[in-house]
Amino acid sequence: MKNILFIGLGLIGGSLASNLKYYQPNLTISAFDADKDQLEKALSIGIIDKKIEDYSEGVKNADIIIYATPVQQTELYLKELPNYQTQSHLIVTDTGSTKSNIQSYEKFLLNNDIHLVGGHPMAGSHKSGVLNSKKHLFENAYYILVYDDARNAESAKKLQTLLSTTSAKFITTSAQEHDYVTGVVSHIPHIIASSLVHLSETNSKNHTLVTQLAAGGFRDVTRIASSNADMWRDITFSNQENILHLLEMLQQQLDSISSHIRLNDTNEVHSFFSGAKKFRDQLPVKQQGALSIAYDLYVDIPDKSGMISKVTSILSLHNISISNLKILEIREDILGALQISFKTPEDRERGIKALSDFETYIL
């Protein structure tokens, strides 16, 4: 399997192409994109071997096709794919955030000797476009492969072998399970974050302190509300049934805690918070999950001149790079005055060791 065709060369498609081109130079990487400028940029930075201007010619020669396009667009491509001449045992995958709609074409494509294995690389960036592609974007991130028909098991293995150079952590599951679980850990949190921001905005009109005090931890908690609105509108409707069910469950929890507060039931309110803390504290902290995250370290430093410089100098001496640094003005429940964000959990662990003279901890 030498000929890999990418349909769509944004951040995700470009990063996958960049990885395959760098680590597997024997492959021929081709790409088709409605935005011709993206193709020219990809060719100029060397992450593809050739640009495809005729879609039918591209799919005709491909051994594997990777659709890095929005879910609705991918569905249109899959629906029409059997109308084109393709290689025997063609393997097709995508990079979308929901899978039930995509995998609904699985048996239809199998009947045409096309093997569909859905893909969901759980990594991304606030930046977009092929020029922001990074070959290491998927390191230590979960990469979920999805199929519902056992006849696609071998194709899933081949796809995982191809993508092994991404250093992602592969999980195989069904479309239904994927969409429900990502609804719990990703889609609902995005809705909650946006709701909190709307709540803050509404109250800021009569309470000017809201905007000022929301600059600290509140901004971190609601960071994902700054995600692309077009993308999240599409994700919401492509996972509509699961999201509505989960919102009903969430509403029941909110109604329950409201009732306990109204009745001054201190034991139940305590159980609400302690139960959440217990479960959260058991969650892994060294791996990337469904939500894109920064690997933060909190450092307790005295309010003295030169202390921040001292911390950054120590990290620099150990060749540890950081992605952000923030002085916390509002830090209830947070001991450290300095928040340092690292790009990887490994860098954070090295940072903890390098800063052994300071009190550090992870939330």
Curated annotation (Swiss-Prot):
The reaction(s) catalysed by this protein are:
prephenate + NAD(+) = 3-(4-hydroxyphenyl)pyruvate + CO2 + NADH
- What GO annotations for molecular function exist for this entry? NAD+ binding; prephenate dehydrogenase (NAD+) activity; prephenate dehydrogenase (NADP+) activity
**Single biological process term from Gene Ontology:** tyrosine biosynthetic process
Q: Where does NAD(+) bind?
A: 3-33
ACT domain residues are 296-363
Could you tell me which CDD domains the record lists for this protein?
A: ACT_PDH-BS
- The answer on whether this UniProt entry bears the keyword Cell membrane reads no
Give start and end of each Prephenate/arogenate dehydrogenase domain. 2-291
Q: Which InterPro entries match?
A: 6-PGluconate_DH-like_C_sf, ACT-like_dom_sf, ACT_dom, NAD(P)-bd_dom_sf, PDH_C, PDH_N, Preph/Arog_dehydrog, Prephen_DH
Pathway it belongs to? Amino-acid biosynthesis; L-tyrosine biosynthesis; (4-hydroxyphenyl)pyruvate from prephenate (NAD(+) route): step 1/1
Keyword Amino-acid biosynthesis assigned to the entry: answer is yes
Question: Which keywords does UniProt give here?
Answer: Amino-acid biosynthesis, Aromatic amino acid biosynthesis, NAD, Oxidoreductase, Tyrosine biosynthesis
Instruction: Enumerate the PROSITE patterns for this protein.
Output: ACT, PDH_ADH
Q: Give EC number(s), comma-separated.
A: 1.3.1.12
Give the record's family classification: Belongs to the prephenate/arogenate dehydrogenase family.
- Record PANTHER family: PREPHENATE DEHYDROGENASE, PREPHENATE DEHYDROGENASE [NADP(+)]
Name of this chain's protein: Prephenate dehydrogenase
State the taxonomy lineage: Bacteria, Bacillati, Bacillota, Bacilli, Bacillales
